[in-house]
């Protein structure tokens, strides 16, 4: 089997969805393996723009089978809204999307819990939650007692199970300070009716995706694994506690999708030509000045899911080298090169200064990373638009010098360059041929 992963190497929002959409026709399957509706993928196809949260970006290609595997947590209401939006635009989602019976459900009580707990944030600073209930759902998944899975929707004991957990959650959330209105919204009878409505529509899509994926792999079919968020948000390896609740780096692919490591052949690490972050947490190369604001405006850096303005900064080679090594990246995709075409001078963070010492690693403790001062290398900008570039030969020499320097600092060749949101604004370099792209 040929398995290729698309992994974000920063704090998410690296334009992974664009690449998955572009690469999908070359594969038989697109597999979404972690995260939930907290992640947003934007795909631009001609005059159409699609904003996807649950559904794999391969859904825009009718001859590609899309699957959502056990590592994903699903809000059925949100997913059905997403499905209805796509169906209204002529995309037959039910025909080529299957959802794992093992996937856990984000229930209405999870969103109440998310907002309530986030009100008492770390150091008064939000950990970056989208209040979509993702963290509490993963917490229940690990705790097991209150977890609801997709298969529970179609089992005979559904109503009893839902009613029992809803009643228990009312008690727990009351103790956390939830309002009477919030508690009433998750009354057992309301949750039972809601689950029944979900089951009626989703039942045809629920399947044993683990068995499907393994059968396809053994039949030597080509698979594209689509990650959500970015590796710096990984629950185990990211900038903890300002992280997500799943393994968003390359280490999460096999567990989330249910495939053995031997079937992952290539890993495409996606990063912007600069850095962005949403929500709280340390960000060594952040620019809290007019340069950062210029990047935000040029890159339209506002969250797909929340609409929140993203924090912007220079490219952090220390962080990207770390996540690229962690994820086993074989080639880089350097996105948003068009944004940097408006600067006379660029900077790249090549090391940190921590308590007077130069370091070349990402500290495990958030407070240590917060104390890190970026050590920059200045690179001459090209200050020439590259939006119309369709090959490496169309790039100004100074732009290619920037690309080469990123390759040197990260230690991995660049296989893809992006100069805009449209599919046509994507350039595959000679290095991409190694991946069979």
Swiss-Prot record:
GO biological process: 'de novo' AMP biosynthetic process; IMP metabolic process
Pfam families, per database record: Adenylsucc_synt
InterPro entries reported for this sequence: Adenylosuccin_syn_GTP-bd, Adenylosuccin_syn_Lys_AS, Adenylosuccinate_synth_dom1, Adenylosuccinate_synth_dom2, Adenylosuccinate_synth_dom3, Adenylosuccinate_synthetase, P-loop_NTPase
EC number(s) from the headed UniProt entry: 6.3.4.4
Full protein name: Adenylosuccinate synthetase
Matching PROSITE patterns: ADENYLOSUCCIN_SYN_1, ADENYLOSUCCIN_SYN_2
Binding site for GTP: 12-18, 40-42, 310, 336-338, 418-420
A GO molecular function held by the record: magnesium ion binding
Annotated positions binding substrate: 304-310
Keyword entries, A-Z: Cytoplasm, GTP-binding, Ligase, Magnesium, Metal-binding, Nucleotide-binding, Purine biosynthesis
């Amino acid at each position: 089997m040929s398995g290729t992963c698309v992994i974000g190497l920063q704090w998410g929002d690296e334009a992974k969805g664009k690449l998955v959409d572009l690469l999908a026709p070359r594969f038989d399957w697109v597999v979404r393996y972690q995260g939930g509706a907290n992640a947003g993928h934007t795909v631009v196809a001609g005059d159409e723009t699609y904003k996807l949260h649950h559904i794999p970006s391969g859904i825009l290609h009718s001859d590609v089978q899309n699957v959502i595997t056990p590592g994903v947590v699903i809000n059925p209401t949100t997913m059905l809204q997403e499905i209805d939006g796509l169906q209204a635009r002529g995309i037959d989602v039910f025909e080529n999307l299957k959802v794992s019976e093992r996937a856990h459900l984000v229930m209405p009580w999870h969103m109440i819990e998310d907002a309530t707990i986030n009100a008492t944030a770390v150091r008064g600073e939000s950990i970056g939650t989208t209040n979509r209930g993702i963290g509490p759902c993963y917490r229940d998944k690990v705790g097991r007692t209150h977890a609801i899975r997709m298969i529970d929707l179609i089992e005979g004991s559904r109503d009893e199970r839902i009613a029992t957990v809803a009643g228990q959650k009312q008690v727990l959330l009351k103790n956390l300070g939830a309002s009477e209105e919030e508690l009433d919204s998750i009354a057992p009878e309301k949750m039972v009716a809601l689950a029944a409505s979900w089951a009626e529509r989703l039942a045809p899509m629920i399947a044993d995706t683990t068995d499907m994926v393994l059968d396809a792999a053994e039949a030597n079919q080509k698979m594209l694994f689509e990650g959500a968020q970015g590796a710096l948000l990984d629950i185990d390896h990211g900038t903890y506690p300002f992280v997500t609740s799943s393994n968003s780096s390359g280490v999460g692919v096999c567990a989330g999708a249910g495939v053995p490591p031997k079937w992952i052949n290539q890993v495409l690490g996606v990063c912007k030509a600069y850095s962005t972050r949403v929500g709280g947490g340390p960000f060594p190369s952040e620019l809290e000045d007019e340069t950062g604001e210029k990047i935000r405006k040029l890159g339209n850096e506002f969250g797909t899911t929340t609409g929140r303005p993203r924090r912007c900064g220079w490219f952090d080679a220390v962080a990207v080298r770390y996540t690229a090594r962690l994820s086993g990246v074989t080639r880089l995709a350097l996105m948003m090169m068009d944004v940097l075409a408006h600067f006379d001078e660029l900077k790249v963070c090549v090391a940190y200064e921590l308590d007077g010492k130069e370091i070349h690693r990402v500290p495990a403790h958030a407070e240590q990373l917060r104390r890190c001062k970026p050590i920059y290398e200045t690179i001459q900008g090209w200050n020439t638009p590259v939006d119309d570039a369709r090959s490496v030969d169309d790039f100004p020499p100074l732009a290619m010098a920037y690309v080469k320097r990123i390759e040197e600092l990260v230690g991995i060749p660049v296989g893809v360059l992006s100069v805009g949101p449209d599919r046509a604004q994507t350039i595959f370099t000679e290095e991409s041929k190694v991946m069979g792209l």
